[in-house]
Amino acid sequence: MMELLANKLNRKYIGIDISEEFLEISKSRIEEINEGQLELTLDFINIISIDNTNEKILIKMEEDMTRKEAKPVLKWAGGKAKLIPIFEEKYPKELIDGKINTYIEPFIGGGAVFFSMLSKYNFDRVVINDINSELILTYKVIKEVPEELINILDKCQNKYNDLKNLEEKQLYYYEIRDKFNEAKGKLNYDIIDDKAIEHAAYMIFINKSCFNGLYRENKKGGFNVPFGKKEKLNCYDRENIMAVSQALKNVIILNGDFEGIIEYVDENTFIYMDPPYRPLNASSNFNEYSKEPFNDDAQRRLSKFFNELNEIGAKIMKSNSDPKNTDENDEFFDELYSNYNISRISASRSINSKGTGRGKVSEILITNY
């Protein structure tokens, strides 16, 4: 695009100043050179672009180098933000060489790896999936109508912070939680209407105001995490929601079982799997992201699916807890994935049902390359 403008000005190249003062000087010079033939407009929130319609060139400036990188909107058990530098050392060579066309996450969760991946690599196709319908609806709402979502979040946050004491805030939290649970299962999760937008806003609100940022469902499918006792609540970042909306713009968003991604997989695909972790003990049982438990049978089914994807030729990286943290003789994953590469990395617990016991633990990373 800049080459097109340079040709118009009979120049080998052209530079654009970020400073508004010097940009105005550059604008004047360009207009003088072309004797009024170019119409230049400045808009510091849009990407640099050139529109040659009607023989007029419109230049729109964006602070592209400093724009906010999308980050997770929700706090989610097993978040991987701190492990990304380690993961980057484990990525397949084909990804680094630009030979991966499709990127897929069948267990999107909070999406830390996903957002990092989109900020550093280009793909022809990106697919995310999760079995949690509330989570996926929230991503769809952010993608389609971020401003409407922010408006509701702002009202919820302001009302919460205006309440006089924790007793009133607690009542308001449970009021929103009850509304959230009442709507679950009654919504059409394929339609983004006012009810869906409100539901997504409530999802974010209770995620930020509940105890320890934990998402947990009971056997009936109801969100059952208690009040987090926060004096002041900051439940959203406007800039980040807009950045996430932009990141999701061309992403295929699925809501279902992990095996549903297979139609998008070929030999030029990289898949990162971050399934609900196998609990290390009773107090770390945080795989209740939906009313259907992700037990050892589900882990075995996932390992068979891993084999199937491997046969297609996809590159796969999978995370999980390391049973050897509590039982050195537990070979569960070592046996399931004995034909693949298994490495152990150090990680910090960020969510615990009791808010205690946080510290360094070993996690496993399985790759087929």
Residue ranges of each PLM-predicted region?
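Class I S-adenosyl-L-methionine-dependent methyltransferase module
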Residues: G15, L23-K60, K120-K249
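S-adenosyl-L-methionine
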Residues: L40, I50, E55-T102, F107-I108, ...
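Conserved Class I SAM-dependent methyltransferase catalytic core
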Residues: K8, Q299-S348
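Conserved proline-anchored active-site loop of SAM-dependent methyltransferases
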Residues: M1-I16, S26, F87, Y103-M117, ...
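Short loop/edge segments at beta-strand edges and connector loops
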Residues: L254-G256, S346
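A structural motif corresponding to the C-terminal end of an alpha-helix
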Residues: D237-I252, S303-I316
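Class I S-adenosyl-L-methionine
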Residues: E335-Y369
